[in-house]
A protein has these predicted regions:
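N-terminal pre-P-loop "Q-motif" helix
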Residues: 24
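S-adenosylmethionine/decaboxylated-SAM
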Residues: 2-19, 27-228
Length: 228
């Protein structure tokens, strides 16, 4: 095992039984079939692009946006400065501007998720979207607290299910997710492709997942047809 990550298990067929494949992460959010009027959180909101998808697709009654909001301080984010990325505004100001149409349902929670998430562990969320700091220790912490945030039937979606990004940064999402699925009672319910392979993976507690019914056998169909 590569020492850049802790040892972690591989998934097997039983862990993805019934999971759906989606062309992109927006399709996955829609395809999860969550009811409108729920409660949704996004950990790491950046420039609000996916926040808009979440509120438009899920129509929640409450949306909590967690971030440290320091993006305006970036000196080189893939060739752009924070000043350029956020139109000369502070990160939080930019986000507030972008989310203004939904201000009635949006609650902004500023600060490190290591601390801010702890006040929301009441199992009231229908979905928590995790896209914060991708270093292993941060992902593990966000995931552990997020499991206490979602309802028993709630869904966790992790962005960037990959080990290394195109800038050669090491990500901790795969080890954390795989351990949750193999050792902590979660199952994969969806996987969303991305054109750059920054894919999303959706998890739900195994005891909340409806397993697909087995296809009836020929003998079973004959018995049903004959009333037996």
């Amino acid at each position: 095992m590569d020492n850049r990550w802790p040892p972690y298990p591989a998934l097997s067929a039983k862990h993805v039984e019934g999971a759906r494949l989606f062309a992109n992460r927006r399709d996955q959010i829609i395809g999860l079939g969550l009811p409108a009027g729920g409660k949704v959180a996004e950990i790491g909101v950046w420039r609000a692009a996916f926040s808009k998808v979440l509120v438009e697709a899920l129509k929640p009654r409450q949306f909590l946006a967690f971030d440290i909001f320091t993006g305006h301080l970036e000196t080189d984010w893939n060739g752009q400065t924070g000043h350029e990325l956020f139109d000369g505004l502070m990160h939080r100001q930019f986000y507030e501007r972008e989310m203004a149409p939904w201000r009635d349902i949006v609650t902004i929670v500023e600060g490190s998720s290591l601390e801010t998430l702890k006040s929301h562990t009441d199992r009231s969320f229908d979905l928590v979207y995790i896209d914060g700091n991708h270093a292993y220790d941060f992902v593990r912490s966000d995931a552990a607290i997020a499991t206490q945030m979602v309802k028993d039937s709630g869904v966790l979606v992790f962005n960037d299910y990959m080990l290394i990004d195109h800038n050669h940064a090491n990500y901790g999402i795969v080890p954390v997710v795989n351990d949750m699925v193999v050792n902590q009672g979660w199952r994969v319910v969806g996987y969303a492709l991305d054109h750059g392979l920054y894919c999303d993976i959706a998890l739900q507690r195994a005891d909340a997942v409806q397993r697909p019914r087995a296809a009836p056998t020929l003998l079973g169909r004959l018995r049903a047809a004959l009333g037996g």
